[in-house]
């Protein structure tokens, strides 16, 4: 499908999938498939020659840094890594000034930080595209790669059921919004008190009403996973929650994705995890290393989904 003529994303920010239409998301996914094929065929494609992406990391990352940096290089551009040591954003210099200064030097900014408001403020003052590489509230780049992986394996998105089992964190938020946008049913199972934010659930349900999807939040993992096409989990204690790790281990134990739980999913279910994984905690080795697991294809798709983003926005 060639939708290049109809969809124009140049100069747009990528802060959350809620800001993108179903058609725009599908366009990015089809472009990612094309770019992945070019890469696999050894075809050089360098539309971003002479372009620079500034990557701001207030939270360290393996996949986000490597995939964005490699993606920019493969597209003919350059990526600049800025840690919180290099850039005292919002402390020494205001976010507004940082945004304006970087806009004079580079062609886009990718930021991975804690507060979602920081990304929104950066985007407000920057005159170049800003990409959300992760916040405490959202992880749209990962969700885009997840949609790509599901599409590759299942051949469609509309009407599938995704079950997310675990902490109602940024990943749960991103997946609910992503599923709602593309017409995929999403059931989230979290322990009491660890559910996704009510405002995000409400927003996802409103989007789902338009796309024909359903969004369900429950405290019962068996209810959520029933007849699921896609089973997804994440770590029980995210970065910054180390102090709560022991308590969370106890609370989340019944939410482990194990052989007994996945028997309730469809026989041809696919297992996804945004990684890093704690084997034996949120998921058993049998499931994560089993034949239904697509976690490395999923991790690889961060590169291709983000390349589609970069080509479209820059």
Curated annotation (Swiss-Prot):
It comes from the Bacteria. Keywords: Amino-acid biosynthesis, Arginine biosynthesis, Cytoplasm, Transferase. InterPro entries: Asp/Orn_carbamoyltranf_P-bd, Asp/Orn_carbamoylTrfase, Asp/Orn_carbamoylTrfase_sf, Asp_carbamoyltransf_Asp/Orn-bd, Orn/put_carbamltrans, OTCase_ArgI. Pathway: Amino-acid biosynthesis; L-arginine biosynthesis; L-arginine from L-ornithine and carbamoyl phosphate: step 1/3. It is an enzyme of class 2 (transferase). L-ornithine binds at residues 170, 234, 238-239. Carbamoyl phosphate binds at residues 61-64, 88, 112, 139-142, 274-275, 302. Its EC number is 2.1.3.3. It catalyses: carbamoyl phosphate + L-ornithine = L-citrulline + phosphate + H(+). GO terms for biological process: arginine biosynthetic process via ornithine; citrulline biosynthetic process; L-arginine biosynthetic process. GO terms for cellular component: cytoplasm. One of its GO terms (molecular function) is amino acid binding. Gene3D superfamilies: Aspartate/ornithine carbamoyltransferase. It is found in: Cytoplasm. Reversibly catalyzes the transfer of the carbamoyl group from carbamoyl phosphate (CP) to the N(epsilon) atom of ornithine (ORN) to produce L-citrulline. Belongs to the aspartate/ornithine carbamoyltransferase superfamily. OTCase family. This is Ornithine carbamoyltransferase. It comes from Anoxybacillus flavithermus (strain DSM 21510 / WK1).
């Amino acid at each position: 499908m060639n939708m290049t003529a109809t969809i124009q994303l140049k100069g747009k920010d990528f802060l959350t999938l809620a800001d993108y239409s179903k058609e725009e998301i599908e366009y990015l996914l089809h472009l990612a498939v094309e770019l992945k094929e070019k890469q696999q065929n050894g075809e050089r494609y360098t539309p971003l020659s002479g372009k620079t992406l500034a990557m701001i990391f207030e939270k360290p990352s393996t996949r986000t840094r490597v995939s964005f940096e490699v993606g920019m290089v493969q597209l003919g551009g350059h990526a600049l890594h800025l840690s919180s040591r290099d850039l005292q954003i919002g402390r020494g210099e205001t976010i507004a000034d940082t945004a304006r200064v970087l806009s004079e030097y580079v062609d886009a900014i990718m930021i991975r930080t804690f507060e979602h408001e920081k990304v929104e403020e950066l985007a407000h003052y920057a005159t170049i595209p800003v990409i959300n590489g992760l916040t405490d509230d959202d992880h749209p780049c990962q969700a885009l790669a997840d949609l790509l992986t599901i599409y590759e394996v299942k051949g469609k998105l509309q009407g599938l059921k995704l079950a997310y089992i675990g902490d109602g964190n940024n990943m749960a938020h991103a997946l609910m919004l992503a599923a709602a946008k593309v017409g995929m049913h999403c059931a989230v199972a979290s322990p009491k008190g660890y559910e996704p934010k009510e405002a995000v659930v409400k927003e996802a349900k409103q989007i789902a009403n338009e796309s024909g999807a359903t969004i369900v939040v429950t405290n019962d993992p068996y209810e959520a996973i029933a007849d699921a096409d896609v089973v997804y989990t994440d770590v029980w204690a995210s970065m910054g929650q180390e102090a709560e790790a022991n308590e969370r281990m106890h609370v989340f134990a019944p939410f482990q994705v194990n052989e007994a739980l996945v028997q309730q999913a469809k026989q041809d279910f696919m297992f996804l995890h945004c990684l890093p994984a704690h084997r034996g905690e949120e998921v058993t080795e049998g499931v994560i290393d089993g034949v239904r697991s697509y976690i490395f294809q999923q991790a690889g798709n961060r590169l291709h989904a983000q390349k589609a983003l970069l080509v479209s926005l820059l």
